[in-house]
Structure formats: structure tokens, C-alpha cells
Curated annotation (Swiss-Prot):
Gene Ontology biological-process annotations: translation
Species name: Acinetobacter baylyi (strain ATCC 33305 / BD413 / ADP1)
Pfam families xref list: Ribosomal_S10 (PF00338)
Signal peptide boundaries: none
Keywords, comma-separated and alphabetical: Ribonucleoprotein, Ribosomal protein
CC terms in the record's Gene Ontology section: ribonucleoprotein complex; ribosome
Protein name, as recorded: Small ribosomal subunit protein uS10
Length: 103
């Protein structure tokens, strides 16, 4: 596992959850002796929706809603076997989507 790299992508609607989860991953990787780059904050995706409040007239009366998707990127440059085992056993919050890629 000396020349490999682990890239972890995190997505969440709550920025506190994603920061907490990324901190847990970084601490776990550093504890096992791996070199870590990140967490790198990626651009936040904002989806905005405008909804008419009135069913018939009053087009000026609208409600506005938005969904923010926060993303973080963590690179583990020199993972050890202990690092992979520790990351597999790590229990993260339910509101965080985790994608792991080996490269």
C-alpha cells in the first residue's frame, strides 16, 4: 500500500456534521501513521426554489427555499494497512454521504 492513495469525498446538507465527520477521519488516519491532505472544502451547491403562495392570483407573493449541499475532500497519501482497517471500522453520522476511491 506504499504507492496508493485513498480519496474520500464527503457530502452533507449540514455543515456541522460534515466538519465533525471529516475531523474524525483525519484524526483516525493520523493516529495510524498515514499522511493526510485535507479536509479541502469544495464549492457549496445551492439550489433555490420559488413557490407561489397563492393558488390563483397575487404572483408577487412567493416563498423562497434553498438546499445547500456541502462537500469536503480528504486525500490520504501514504496509507498503511492499519489505516484501511481503522477507516472501515469508523462509524460516521447518518447525514453524511461518504465515497471512497483508491488510486
Amino acid at each position: 500500500m506504499s504507492n496508493q492513495r485513498i480519496r474520500i469525498r464527503l457530502k452533507s446538507f449540514d455543515h456541522r456534521l460534515i466538519d465533525q465527520s471529516s475531523q474524525e477521519i483525519v484524526e483516525t488516519a493520523k493516529r495510524t501513521g498515514a499522511q493526510v491532505c485535507g479536509p479541502i472544502p469544495m464549492p457549496t451547491r445551492i439550489e433555490r426554489f420559488n413557490v407561489l403562495t397563492s393558488p390563483h392570483v397575487n404572483k408577487d407573493a412567493r416563498d423562497q427555499y434553498e438546499i445547500r449541499t456541502y462537500k469536503r475532500l480528504i486525500d490520504i497519501v501514504q496509507p498503511t494497512d492499519k489505516t484501511v482497517d481503522a477507516l472501515m471500522k469508523l462509524d460516521l453520522a447518518a447525514g453524511v454521504d461518504v465515497q471512497i476511491a483508491l488510486g
